[in-house]
Amino acid sequence: MLHAKIRRLPNNMASQVSSTCSDELSPEEQALVVKVWNEGARLYRDLPWRNVDDPYAVMVSEIMLQQTQVARVEKYWQRFMALFPTLDALASAETSLVLEMWQGLGYNRRALALKRTAEICSREFNGLLPESSEELLALPGIGKATAGGIMAFAYQKPSMYLETNVRTVFIHELFPGREKVSDKELEPSVQRTCSAEDPRGWYYALLDYGNYLKSTMPNPSRRSKHHTKQSKFEGSRRQKRAELVRFVLARREASFCELVAALSDFEKKQGREAPEEDIVRSIVNDLVAEGFFSQEGEGENARYLAD
């Protein structure tokens, strides 16, 4: 492969890299590699999780970065790691404390999945994160992209890491003007261009260049076949879920009537109608089933507790 081992490349590295191009890469892929290494060196972001040698810390950052902006994750990641510095520490923590730390990041299911992953690793892997893609994919909340990121960033192993910034670069450089570009079309190039010697540095360069592209032009990843607009949060079921979780965490315990009243007050303050009790009950039942809080008693006597 035509990659260097260092993350920050000097300005003259393009010619050196170009002279070592692999025959298996197309001319377009060779040009992409040269450009990405050089742009990545110029645009490198010194993020806190890039300066640690801890697979668990890398995993936390990758899960937080799912659908959340980097600037917000920076603040939360450092606080989270200070409170839960190891997989064992997270595994033994109260679920309510983990959820409290997560408030403001959104998509609270990620916090529950992260804690369950920590519990599995503590119980089955001696408090360590597995080092194979297959074992990582079996853990809660870890899909193909997250597993690929962990393999590259935590273990310096070549992997398929196709997330939004990476997708942006490959669509922009290899499919100019094309609409509805599928991941199946991108994956062979992503696989072929991944550095065997420094996958970590390679994907850092892709991420930073992709982030730059999105800030300077219409987002190329919108031309992906898989691009979807994030659903509206205001007034959504997701917002109602988040509000009920916040209420139980703050109160530690609440009755169903209190949950109905709290959500009704919240909706009215937003200029919306109070939700029907059946909707509230459906949401509460889902939250209990998913492990956000526990239920004691049934029917009108039920109480909901932060665990």
Which functions belong to the PLM regions below?
Residues 288-299:
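A short, conserved structural fragment
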Residues 20-241, 247, 251-257, 262-271, ...:
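Catalytic cores of DNA base-excision repair glycosylases
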Residues 281-285:
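Short, hydrophobic-biased segments on the C-terminal half of alpha helices
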Residues 297-307:
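Short, cationic-aromatic polyanion-contact patches
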Residues 11-12:
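Intrinsic-disorder-associated, low-complexity terminal segments enriched in Asp/Asn/His/Tyr and depleted
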Residues 7-8:
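Basic polycationic patches enriched in arginine
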